[in-house]
């Protein structure tokens, strides 16, 4: 997984880390048509932009669904519920950028590392990780999730769940230019 590339065998996505200013994380996402769609989610303090390189994507941002093709772009403002999926017949390639990056590198390293071990994010893992990543499901409201996760987190820790795992730290490696 090192060298600027991560894969998620569960969602079938491939992530290529691209050069970016220190406060941002830029990634080329490659997703086949049979990918697993991310849940509707939000980043409380980061904007996430999407710029399509190849293929067709459908984005649901703030309740509005839009189809994007090559060279189209769209942004989810901080706190705006969003998701996306490959709505074409071939490989989807797009660049996503998180501004500011906060701990999104850790998010990708942890999720891809767990997926490589055959583990899917479940409630205990989400309770342990969500506050670190500042990423939440779109529903129930964030205040409810934060309260629920605060109650669950000690049990998650007792069962060995962590917000991040040292064995995955740095697995995204140095930024690469995509081929």
What feature does the model see in each segment?
Residues 1-26, 35-40, 44-46, 51, ...:
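Jelly-roll (double-stranded beta-helix
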């Amino acid at each position: 997984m090192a060298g600027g590339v991560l894969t998620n065998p569960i969602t079938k996505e491939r992530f290529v880390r691209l050069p970016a200013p220190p406060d941002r994380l830029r990634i080329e996402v490659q997703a086949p048509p049979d990918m697993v769609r991310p849940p509707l989610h939000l980043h409380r303090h980061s904007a996430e932009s999407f710029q399509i390189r190849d293929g067709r994507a459908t984005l649901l941002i703030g309740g509005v669904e839009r189809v994007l093709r090559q060279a189209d772009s769209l942004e989810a403002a901080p706190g705006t519920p969003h998701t996306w999926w490959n709505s074409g017949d071939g490989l989807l390639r797009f660049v996503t950028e998180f501004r500011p990056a906060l701990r999104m590198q850790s998010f990708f390293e942890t999720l891809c590392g767990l997926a490589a071990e055959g583990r899917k994010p479940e409630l205990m893992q989400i309770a342990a990780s969500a506050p670190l990543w500042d990423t939440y499901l779109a529903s129930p409201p964030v205040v409810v999730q934060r309260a629920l996760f605060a109650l669950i987190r000690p049990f998650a820790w007792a069962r060995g769940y962590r917000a991040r795992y040292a064995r995955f730290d740095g697995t995204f490696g140095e930024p690469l230019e995509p081929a």
